[in-house]
Regions:
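Short loop/turn and low-complexity linker motifs enriched in small/turn-promoting residues
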Residues: 1-173
Length: 173
C-alpha cells in the first residue's frame, strides 16, 4: 500500500471534493490522520471538484510503502454562472456533514459547508434537485421550489447503507 496526501494552498482547495478512481472519498482537508488515503500500488485517477472552478484531474502512480503528495490547484471556471440579487437561500442541515452535495446533478460542496448559523447556498429561483450522498450511507434526494429572496432549509440524516448503493454521481466525477 502507498499513502496519498493532499496539499491545497487556499480554502477553495481544502474544501474541494476528492474522487479516486471515480469514487467520492471526502473533501481535501479531512483526508488525513484516521481518514488518510491508502491505495494499492499502481495508477490511480484523482479528481478534485468545487463549484465555480474547473475540475482538477491527475493520474498518480502509487508505489508500495511510499508517501505521495499531490499539490492541488483550483482555477476559476469562466463558464460558471452565479445567482443574481433575486437569489433564494438554501440551508442544509445534514448528517454526516462530510457527505457530498449535488444541485441539479452538479457537485457544489460538502454538506458541512452549507449548514450552521452562517452557512447556506444561494440558488436561482425555481425548481432544483438536491442530492446528498456518501459511500457507506443511503442517498437522500429531494426537490425544492424556491421563490426570489426565499429562505429555506433541508434537513436529512443519512442512514447507514452499503457501498453497493452508491449513486452514479458519487462513483463518477
Amino acid at each position: 500500500m502507498g499513502e496519498l496526501q493532499f496539499a491545497g494552498a487556499s480554502q477553495v482547495e481544502r474544501d474541494s471534493g476528492v474522487w479516486i478512481d471515480g469514487q467520492y472519498v471526502g473533501y481535501l482537508k479531512e483526508l488525513k490522520d484516521e481518514k488518510k488515503v491508502m491505495l494499492l500500488p499502481g495508477e490511480h485517477e484523482i479528481g478534485v471538484r468545487q463549484a465555480g472552478y474547473k475540475d482538477f484531474t491527475q493520474t498518480m502512480l502509487i508505489e508500495p510503502g511510499t508517501v505521495h503528495t499531490l499539490a492541488v490547484s483550483m482555477s476559476k471556471d469562466p463558464r460558471a454562472v452565479f445567482p443574481d440579487g433575486s437569489a433564494a437561500e438554501l440551508k442544509l442541515n445534514v448528517k454526516p456533514e462530510r457527505a457530498a452535495v449535488f444541485v441539479d446533478d452538479g457537485y457544489v460542496g460538502h454538506a458541512g459547508h452549507f449548514g450552521g448559523v452562517f452557512n447556506s447556498m444561494l440558488l436561482s429561483p425555481g425548481k432544483h434537485r438536491i442530492k446528498v450522498a456518501l459511500p457507506g450511507y443511503r442517498t437522500f434526494e429531494t426537490e425544492v421550489s424556491l421563490l426570489p429572496g426565499q429562505k429555506s432549509e433541508v434537513k436529512a440524516e443519512l442512514p447507514k447503507g452499503s457501498i453497493e448503493q452508491a449513486e452514479p454521481l458519487i462513483k463518477k466525477p
